[in-house]
């Protein structure tokens, strides 16, 4: 499925999540906008820095799809909250098909923890464009072995480095 195939999206979730149904105008509100997050994930396949900053906030395909996202409360999902934070999604496609997900929790929630590798990958994705790939890789290498190191000072020393220009390795 790709974004061009989607007519509308329905998200069934708990009350508190339904309250996050705005179309964002800045990074802070983008991070908490359920329609925007769903649309960005469908359009771009991810929700990263570029999706929640001006590039994503001004993407007409994301905005149009976000406006087609309907959020509805589900009694069973309300009952599970706050211990669990579920959502179920229906993608209504232009060809008439409806694709429905199971009730799932967001990746990174306590019940759907990120693996160490996913955390390292996210760190690298966020730091390499600012600090450079070499710095990011060296920092990760140092961090992975810090529990056995005699001191954390090498890691702290790396935190005092001035960022390189964007895109520099």
Residue locations for each model-derived region?
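Terminal-appendage/accessory-domain detector
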Residues: 1-169
